[in-house]
Amino acid sequence: LGLETYLQLCGNRELKLENCRKVLEYNEIRIVVQTTELILEIWGRNLEADSRTPECLWIHGEIQSISLTPKGGRHGTAAAR
């Protein structure tokens, strides 16, 4: 039974991601995260990840874009303005 992914973006400085399965890549300009149904790419500057609970990941820094790729589906991008 898979849980839905929940994203909460606060401006371009903070992203809360619930139901995260695995962090695939992590550096100060790019964080790639796998959830039950998505692969998320977060691009920016001075990015940091903080896991406060096993299911919840907070990403801080200057978030410039978020790319969502459904597993086996089409690719979508949301850019911070």
Feature map (PLM): residue ranges:
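Mature-chain termini and adjacent capping regions
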Residues: 1-25, 30-81
